[in-house]
């Protein structure tokens, strides 16, 4: 799979590098967090939210909105699914990582998406990017099989269990995105080979992308 640097102009439609906030301490603390054999995501970690980066990112990057800082760590080389939010997400990498991204605008009317349209970018250690709200993404991937540690910043309350019942694919509302809603502020399309929960909408067409191929 062709992997471009995060500074390549091709990334501009997906996000931008953040260089106006000091995240040194965030990277340092992130390097003390666990790196399992699989992938673990924690939406909110007290030790990360106690750092100066919490206020700086809330004030500068999110325009004084309340935010949460967690992490996505582990070992991974596969796409498995794509998701998007109603807001930008910040990925702050304590290690090298690969981001596989696409465009929400390319989701078909039947709520499917062709993975051949996705691109991969290398996010170097000690680098943070804003991933725009319309950018399809999922868990980062490691470089050459190595583990990764990436802090994940989102508006507070994102990625928690839903409280309401939402429309299924056979509902009148299926023309909209409601069947994709998998958690608060999280719309998801899974791949049949992604090992997702049975409740996930499976709509990715094409290969379950592998960054090592």
Question: Model regions: which residues?
Answer:
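Active-site region of the double-stranded beta-helix
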Residues: 1-125, 139-147, 151-213
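Histidine-centered metal-chelating micro-motifs
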Residues: 127-129, 134-138
């Amino acid at each position: 799979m062709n992997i471009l640097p995060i500074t390549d102009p091709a990334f501009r439609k997906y996000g931008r590098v953040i260089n106006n906030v000091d995240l040194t301490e965030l990277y340092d603390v992130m390097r003390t967090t666990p790196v399992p054999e699989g992938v673990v995501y924690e939406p909110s970690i007290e030790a990360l939210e106690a750092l100066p980066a919490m206020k700086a990112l809330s004030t500068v990057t999110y325009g004084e909105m309340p935010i949460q800082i967690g992490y996505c760590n582990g070992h991974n080389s596969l796409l498995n699914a794509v998701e998007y939010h109603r807001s930008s997400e910040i990925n702050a990498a304590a290690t090298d990582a690969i981001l596989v991204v696409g465009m929400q605008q390319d989701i078909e009317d039947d709520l499917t998406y062709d993975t051949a349209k996705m691109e991969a970018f290398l996010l170097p250690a000690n680098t943070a990017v804003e991933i725009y709200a319309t950018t399809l993404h999922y868990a980062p991937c490691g470089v050459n099989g190595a583990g990764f540690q990436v802090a994940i910043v989102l508006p507070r309350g994102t990625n928690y269990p839903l409280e309401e019942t939402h429309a299924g694919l056979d509902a009148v509302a299926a023309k909209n995105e409601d069947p994709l809603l998998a958690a608060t502020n999280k719309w998801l399309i899974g791949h049949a080979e992604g090992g997702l929960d049975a409740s996930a909408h499976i709509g990715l067409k094409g290969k379950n992308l592998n960054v090592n191929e």
